[in-house]
Amino acid sequence: MAELKNDRYLRALLKQPVDRTPVWMMRQAGRYLPEYKATRAEAGDFMSLCKNQDLACEVTLQPLRRYDLDAAILFSDILTVPDAMGLGLYFETGEGPRFQRPTDTIDSIKKLCIPDPEDELGYVMRAVSTIRRELKGEVPLIGFSGSPWTLATYMVEGGSSKTFEKIKKMAYEEPATLHLLLDKLADSVILYLNAQVANGAQSLMIFDSWGGALSHHAYREFSLRYMQKIVDGLTRHADGRQVPVTLFTKGGGLWLESMAETGCDALGLDWTVDIGDARRRVGHKVALQGNMDPSVLYASPERIHQEVDQILSSYGEGTGHVFNLGHGIHQHVDPEHAGSFINSVHELSAQYHK
């Protein structure tokens, strides 16, 4: 593997000195870019794009050609793991992801097999190794997975949900059944993420997109408990370097202290959290990633600049901050505005690292 030329992102996650605040964007390879749309059209559909290692590599690299980013993130989907368990993932226009065979009974959950990441998920591993090779050491590669709770919401509900009625019913009516599913998913995610590291991922992120839908105590029981299990089981060193781990619970501002106790290296923040307050609460233990509202990118470059300045000022001096959005970039954002955001981080952040 080529030697890493820009390790700013990895250093910030480990709270080591940096010359400026590193920046990347969740969903930076995505529908806001015309070149992504062209590649997706070439693939035919979303999952065909994910499963073609050369096209997945191409869309991963596209934002890096446009912008001076400090990290690349694997182009894939969080639902690859349940798909590999045989649930029959498909996408309906306007409806999002759906499963042909939901796992909403104890019998269906008992039948689930933990997928071999080099077999059923081999296409992801081939994409990871291809991307790592093609990056040529320019920036580190982030691997990722959904959290067990978030994956389970799709598996039990049969797809996206606004109310999570089925899985919450299971949580309170048949908690042992849900724990069986979450435990299988945690084991699957550990294997999946460790295989990503073995194939070239240099940092890992766990997306708990729907943890914020849980009550205070239910979050610890059904989400955090299983992210803790994953953190405990991950490969934390590869290629002579530490492999940092970031946990991100959307709507998780209540639980930052508990999340920081897992032993992860960093926490992702959504835009509802004041990053300065988060630093005072947990900055002695973990780095922080975030957290500009993605909708700010609809604003003028001047307003984007102001928002970046405000977040940098709130975090304050020193390392331990990776600038990002508070969630994925919206598909209708002007790519030029994304460029303004990244340039503003570069321009304004150096003064905080003297």
UniProtKB/Swiss-Prot annotation:
Name it. Uroporphyrinogen decarboxylase
Q: Which PROSITE patterns match?
A: UROD_1, UROD_2
The UniProt record lists the EC number as 4.1.1.37
- In the UniProt record, does the keyword Ribosomal protein occur? no
Which InterPro entries does this one have? UROD/MetE-like_sf (IPR038071), Uroporphyrinogen_deCO2ase_HemE (IPR006361), Uroporphyrinogen_deCOase (IPR000257)
- The positions annotated as site (Transition state stabilizer) read 77
Record's NCBIfam families?
hemE
Q: How does it assemble?
A: Homodimer.
Q: Which gene encodes it?
A: hemE
Q: Which Gene3D superfamilies match?
A: 3.20.20.210
Q: Which reaction does it catalyse?
A: uroporphyrinogen III + 4 H(+) = coproporphyrinogen III + 4 CO2
One BP term from GO = protoporphyrinogen IX biosynthetic process from glutamate
Tell me the enzyme class: lyase
Q: What is the lineage of its organism?
A: Bacteria, Pseudomonadati, Pseudomonadota, Gammaproteobacteria, Alteromonadales
Naturally occurring in which organism (per UniProt): Shewanella sediminis (strain HAW-EB3)
Record: residues binding substrate: 27-31, 77, 154, 209, 327
Could you name the Gene Ontology cellular component terms for this entry?
cytosol
Give the family, as the similarity comment puts it. Answer: Belongs to the uroporphyrinogen decarboxylase family.
Q: In which pathway does it act?
A: Porphyrin-containing compound metabolism; protoporphyrin-IX biosynthesis; coproporphyrinogen-III from 5-aminolevulinate: step 4/4
Keywords for this protein: Cytoplasm, Decarboxylase, Lyase, Porphyrin biosynthesis
**CDD domains assigned:** URO-D
* Superkingdom to which the source organism belongs: Bacteria
For molecular function, the Gene Ontology terms on record are: uroporphyrinogen decarboxylase activity
Q: Where in the cell is it found?
A: Cytoplasm
Q: What does this protein do?
A: Catalyzes the decarboxylation of four acetate groups of uroporphyrinogen-III to yield coproporphyrinogen-III.
Decide whether keyword Cytoplasm is in the record. yes
